[in-house]
Amino acid sequence: MTTFRIEGGIWMALGSIMWKRAIVLVVLILPALCCAQDAKLIEGAKKEGQVVYYTTMTLDQSKHTTDQFEKKYPFLKVTLFRTGGGPLLNKILTEARGGRFDWDVVVGRGEMVIPLIDRKLLASYRSPESKMIDAQLVDDEGYWTAYYVNSYVLGWNTKLVKREDVPKTYDALLNPRWKGGQISLDTEAYGMVEGLKRAWGREKAIAYFKRLAALDPVLKRGNTERVQLLVAGEYPLIIAYNQTIQRMTSRGAPVDWLALEPAVTQVNPVMIAAKAPHPNAARLFYDYLLSKEGQEQLRGYQRIPVRKDVEPDPPRLFRGFKYTIENPECRDYL
């Protein structure tokens, strides 16, 4: 018995030593492998010399981001093209039909994902930065990762509506009090429709939007101009991106917002072209957008970053409320 215990102790000790050595090897070898991979990527990018970036993010913000990237990697030049979501998707598809594959990286709206996947226009790439991003915001097959998100919330003009009178739930928003041009809705808020279908089921979501439409809301495309009209008092309520409303609130405008739960959070994915002319530079830029540095730039723009170690400004933009993620790979937005 004594001998067995001693031998057992020896094996336990040996096992402990081997385990510790394994940990040491992992700690030493993995960073070395990552550095080697980074060095290979950078070397390849140097030979390519440029990256072509298509985006729907505003031109001033996109230009600032690409300028900072070029400072970090002075051997690369970024060619930037910016337009809206629909026109950008049309541009990519039209170019592909004509045999042109000019772009490397694209940031756009979630509804771009399926058309690009179906036409085999996206490359699969899992960025090492994705480990700092919620799994819901990273595609399992590597075709996209959320770059930033937008949450649809209810905003109001504080001069026209008292806080205690603001609807706090989706059902409260259906009160006949808000009938007749009292609510502003985006004509292209497909992500919100899809998100509530995901949360509630198709039948309940469609029934809800029919009841909302019966209130005769003010219909207009986009967010920025609609929020400006809210500030001007054109209507008392709006469903819009919280970041757009928050920018005006931070400037002292008479507007505020709250989340109707679950708030639908729309993904703005970053993707790499399957036939990227500069594949190494594309991956380097992709990693940069998702890095802590790249995500902190988004915070500076008052957009909503997706990294766990980068808080939005203010944090309430993506903290303190329940949300449901829009599925960029949804095939049925209606």
Residue spans of the language-model regions?
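Immediate post-signal peptide segment of exported/extracytoplasmic ligand-binding proteins
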Residues: 36-52, 70-71, 175-180
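Short amphipathic alpha-helical coupling segments at ligand-binding clamshell hinges
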Residues: 65, 204, 208-211, 277-289, ...
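A ligand-binding cleft/hinge motif common to bilobed small-molecule-binding domains
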Residues: 110-115, 236-256
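A bilobed periplasmic-binding-protein/Venus flytrap-type ligand-binding module shared by bacterial periplasmic
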Residues: 153-160, 197-199, 267-278, 297
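An extracytoplasmic/periplasmic, membrane-proximal ligand-sensing/linker region
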Residues: 203-205, 306-334
